[in-house]
From Swiss-Prot:
Cross-link named Glycyl lysine isopeptide (Lys-Gly) (interchain with G-Cter in SUMO1), sites: 156
Residues modified as N6-acetyllysine: 237
UniProt protein name: Pinin
Organism: Mus musculus (Mouse)
Gene label: Pnn
Biased composition regions of type Basic residues, renumbered to the chain: 563-583, 642-660
Lineage start: Eukaryota, Metazoa, Chordata, Craniata, Vertebrata
Similarity-based family: Belongs to the pinin family.
Coiled-coil features, chain-numbered ranges: 2-32, 162-233, 286-373, 444-467
Compositional bias segments (type: Pro residues): 471-487
Compositional bias ranges of the Acidic residues kind: 329-339
Any one cellular-component term (Gene Ontology): desmosome
Chain residue ranges for the region called Disordered: 46-138, 278-521, 545-725
Subcellular location(s) of the protein: Nucleus speckle; Cell junction, Desmosome
Region entry Sufficient for PSAP complex assembly, spans: 220-283
């Protein structure tokens, strides 16, 4: 411990010497010793005088000095204020005027005219003439003018020289000021640093002094404990130290134990002392580190200020002298600005390029999407073409079947004008009701549908001319045998109701029915032996016939006859006006209708009144079915063209598959139902009634085999009938 104390004392002496050096440096800078502390009271007295600070004491001192010094008397303050002073001045002026007025009244001054008088023009002209005439005056004027010009030039030169000198002087003064400021800053920095060093040294001295004191105390404590170790310490507190007069083994053990305990205490105390000294050393280190950081920051600030001052000086020098360095710096600055502008421009160009790339990508994606849509449309176009071809084929099949039905009906019955004139009346009776219903529901569609039917008939005739050998097609037989009136109505209704409808459109009139083919009854199917397999396999489509209320017609009204005849004549005239081909098609259709009516008339003449009504109802249903089939083709084509315009290609495919399935199922159901209906009718009918259809069948077969007329003869007859009408 003695060694540690000596080392600390040596450090303390060194610190004191360094502190003395710092004080000497401060004395050199400031001119006074920092250790000389002046008393505060003396400072205050020197500053403020006996009054003790600012206030009335200083004023009293000043007044005393002014009064005693023999100088000018001090100005006395007017306590009344400025207004009173102004008023006093006015009063003094008035008094002075009053005193001077009587003197002026006594001595009357003479009135003098003004000395400023306008000179006459004649006199000035004379003077000018005199001056021009004198040569001496001219010379004198020239001399004076020359002197004036010379003096002015001299003044000008002197002024320019003075300005240059003033500029130089200003430059020198500015430089001196800058140098003085720099020196002053340096002095301040040195002074600050010295004072900071002084403070740091003082803190170090204090710490060293504390360490020395602690070390001395530790040494004293160690010396004291070294003496105590020789004694036995009691276990109880306060501890007592004793030594027995004679040592025994028990006391020897106690001495050893007490020495162990005391040594442990000494070790603990030494460790604590060392830790405390380390802590004391760490505190000034931290403070010194903080001070160093502050110094570094201050030095940086000073350097920045100096650089700013130098830059300002350079700028001023360059502006005043106009050296080449200014141009070089300006060029460098311009190059730097150009570089920065180039960098900014390059950044902007990069951004523009990125935007352009994004736009190009978007345009490419849009073009790809358009190409895909075009491919899809092209793929859908052949599907539409296939749909159109299928429609045309289906329409051809239906038209051919209609022609076969008409030809068979015409061939089965002999065309006679008398029978047609007689039997036209019941047919027109039955046709009036559906026409009325159609007009009430859709009167605007008759003309359109009639034109479409005429166009289709023209296409038929062209195809017939191109194809000389028509294919053999199934022959449609007339409908099942007629039965009495009470049973005819319920049988006609089940035929129309159970048949499923393929199209989802609302059927308001018979012209807008779907494509359909009349299914012959089972008895007729058995008799037809010359049917082709193609026609048997053809899928049969259902028909929704308009339900016509069939009533017994025993008396025919003349009014209905005239109305129906006029309608048929007007239609025939319109068709004759359009074209000859259309008139031919219309005449063929009218002849077929007349033939059907004549067949119904022949059957009705053989039976009673009830059988007549049933046969007429069957003929009307057959006629209406033929009309429905013709109109259904046009309506189906219209509906499909509309759906094609809407672009529901996928829906069409799905519907076609579903329609084909339904047609197959509906054809089977109809065959079963027709067979069931025929069997039920046979059971319900009596033996007498069942004999009548057998007669009719024999008549129709004989007429078929014996009497067949060519199409040309039929066309001629129809033309003659149209001309007669």
């Amino acid at each position: 411990m003695a060694v540690a104390v000596r080392a600390l004392q040596e450090q303390l002496e060194k610190a004191k010497e360094s502190l003395k050096n710092v004080d000497e440096n401060i004395r050199k800078l400031t001119g006074r010793d920092p250790n000389d502390v002046r008393p505060i009271q003396a400072r205050l007295l020197a500053l403020s005088g006996p009054g003790g600070g600012r206030g009335r004491g200083s004023l009293l001192l000043r007044r005393g000095f002014s009064d005693s010094g023999g100088g000018p008397p001090a100005k006395q303050r007017d306590l009344e204020g400025a207004v009173s002073r102004l008023g006093g001045e006015r009063r003094t002026r008035r008094e002075s005027r009053q005193e001077s007025d009587p003197e002026d009244d006594d001595v009357k001054k003479p009135a003098l005219q003004s000395s400023v008088v306008a000179t006459s023009k004649e006199r000035t002209r004379d003077l000018i003439q005199d001056q021009n005439m004198d040569e001496k005056g001219k010379q004198r004027n020239r001399r004076i003018f020359g002197l004036l010009m010379g003096t002015l030039q001299k003044f000008k030169q002197e002024s320019t020289v003075a300005t240059e000198r003033q500029k130089r002087r200003q430059e020198i003064e500015q430089k001196l000021e800058v140098q003085a400021e720099e020196e002053r800053k340096q002095v301040e920095n040195e002074r600050r640093e010295l004072f900071e060093e002084r403070r740091a040294k003082q803190t170090e001295l204090r710490l060293l002094e504390q360490k020395v004191e602690l070390a001395q105390l530790q040494e004293e404590w160690n010396e004291h404990n070294a003496k105590i170790i020789k004694y036995i310490r009691t276990k109880t507190k306060p501890h007592l130290f004793y030594i027995p007069g004679r040592m025994c083994p028990a006391t020897q053990k106690l001495i050893e134990e007490s020495q162990r305990k005391m040594n442990a205490l000494f070790e603990g105390r030494r460790i604590e002392f060392a830790e405390q000294i380390n802590k004391m050393e760490a505190r000034p280190r931290r403070q010194s580190m903080k001070e160093k950081e502050h110094q570094v920051v201050r030095n940086e600030e000073q350097k920045a200020e100096q650089e700013e001052g130098k830059v300002a000086q350079r700028e001023e020098e360059l502006e005043e002298t106009g050296n080449q360095h200014n141009d070089v710096e300006v060029e460098e600055a311009g190059e730097e600005e150009e570089k920065e502008a180039g960098i900014v421009h390059s950044d902007a160009e990069k951004e523009q390029e990125e935007e352009e790339q994004k736009q190009e990508m978007e345009v490419k994606t849009e073009e790809e999407a358009e190409v895909r849509e075009g491919e899809k449309q092209q793929d859908s176009q052949p599907e539409e073409v296939m749909d159109v071809l299928e429609m045309v084929e289906s329409v051809k099949h239906v038209i051919a079947e209609q022609e076969v039905m008409e030809t068979n009906q015409v061939e089965s019955i002999e065309p006679s004008e008398n029978e047609t004139s007689k039997e036209l009346e019941p047919e027109m009776e039955f046709d009036v009701e559906p026409d009325k219903e159609c007009k009430s529901l859709s009167p605007g569609k008759e003309n359109i549908n009639s034109q479409e039917v005429e166009k289709e008939s023209e296409e038929k005739e062209e195809k017939e001319e191109k194809e000389p050998e028509p294919q053999p097609e199934p022959v449609a037989q007339p409908q099942p045998p007629p039965q009495p009136l009470p049973q005819s109505q319920p049988h006609s209704q089940p035929h129309s109701q159970p048949q499923p409808v393929l199209q989802s459109q609302p059927l308001c009139q018979p012209e807008t029915l779907p494509l359909a083919v009349l299914q012959p009854p089972p008895q007729v199917i058995q008799e037809q032996g010359n049917l082709l397999p193609e026609r048997k396999d053809f899928p049969l489509e259902s028909i929704k016939l308009p339900e016509v209320s069939v009533e017994p017609v025993l008396t025919v009204h003349s009014e209905n006859k005239s109305k129906n005849k006029t309608r048929s004549r007007s239609r025939g005239r319109a068709r004759n006006k359009t074209s000859k081909s259309r008139s031919r098609s219309s005449s063929s259709s009218s002849s077929s209708s007349s033939s059907t009516s004549s067949s119904s008339g022949s059957s009705s003449s053989s039976g009673s009144s009830s059988s007549r009504s049933s046969s007429s109802s069957s003929s009307s249903t057959s006629g209406s079915s033929s009309r429905d089939s013709s109109s259904s083709t046009s309506s189906s084509s219209e509906s499909r063209s509309r759906s094609r315009g809407r672009g529901h290609n996928r829906d069409r495919k799905h519907r076609r598959s579903m329609d084909r399935k339904r047609r197959d199922t509906s054809g089977l159901e109809r065959s079963h139902k027709s067979s069931k209906g025929g069997s039920s009718r046979d059971r319900k009918g009596s033996k007498d009634k069942s004999s009548r259809p057998d007669r009719k069948r024999s008549i129709s077969e004989s007429s078929r085999s014996g009497k067949r007329s060519s199409r040309s003869e039929r066309d001629r007859k129809s033309d003659r009938k149209d001309k007669r009408r």
